[in-house]
Design a protein with these regions (language model features):
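PLP-dependent enzyme catalytic core of the Aspartate aminotransferase-like
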Residues: 123-157
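Conserved PLP-binding catalytic core of the aspartate aminotransferase-like
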Residues: 89-115
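Generic non-transmembrane alpha-helical segments
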Residues: 80, 84-88, 109-115, 148-156
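Generic structural signal for hydrophobic core residues of well-folded globular domains
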Residues: 58-62, 105, 149-153
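Active-site C-terminal subdomain of aminotransferase-like
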Residues: 1-95
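Residues in well-ordered beta-strands of folded domains
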Residues: 2, 19, 56, 102-104, ...
Length: 157
């Protein structure tokens, strides 16, 4: 099980939580870390001591009930974004257990307006953007994005 502290919990820098079984951990490949002069099992590339403290502080501050409510809202909004993209015929991809929705990249104007992250992947149809549906993403903000995407679809006709 893995969870992004950055993309789900909103921590201001990349970090994550990874839970595994002892068998998987014990059978993981080791990597030679030249600057440590040692072989190590590496699940993540960071050894920051601050990020786990931020993660712990957030977990304790918000609490189980708070995170349960936030997770429900995040996934509700993720499903809403997907249903709206489907409704306007805009291609998208998403793992049902993820709050990241990847979709065909819109115009540069829309990318700038919403500060969309962009990339390319031939397997998914070329130029892409994605939205990470977090606590600050609302149905109103999704509706505004969808309206702009719909306008692009109409202007393409």
């Amino acid at each position: 099980i893995s969870v992004s502290g950055h993309k789900f919990f909103g921590i201001d820098s990349p970090c994550g939580l990874f839970i595994t079984t002892r068998d998987v951990y014990d059978n993981q490949s080791t990597y030679d870390i030249s600057y440590l002069n040692a072989n190590m099992r590496m699940i993540n590339c960071s050894r920051s001591g601050i990020e786990p403290l931020k993660f712990w502080w957030l977990m304790k501050t918000v609490g189980d009930e708070g995170w349960t409510e936030q997770a429900a809202r995040i996934f509700e909004n993720t499903r809403y974004l997907k249903s709206e993209l489907k409704r306007i015929g805009w291609p998208y991809w998403n793992n049902e257990y993820s709050n990241t929705v990847i979709f065909r990249r819109p115009s540069a104007k829309v990318v700038r307006k919403y500060n969309l992250a962009c990339g390319e992947d031939a397997a998914f149809g070329g130029k892409l953007s994605h939205v990470v549906v977090m606590q600050h993403v609302t149905k109103d903000s999704i509706d505004r994005l969808i309206a702009d995407l719909r306008d692009e679809t109409i202007s393409d006709l």
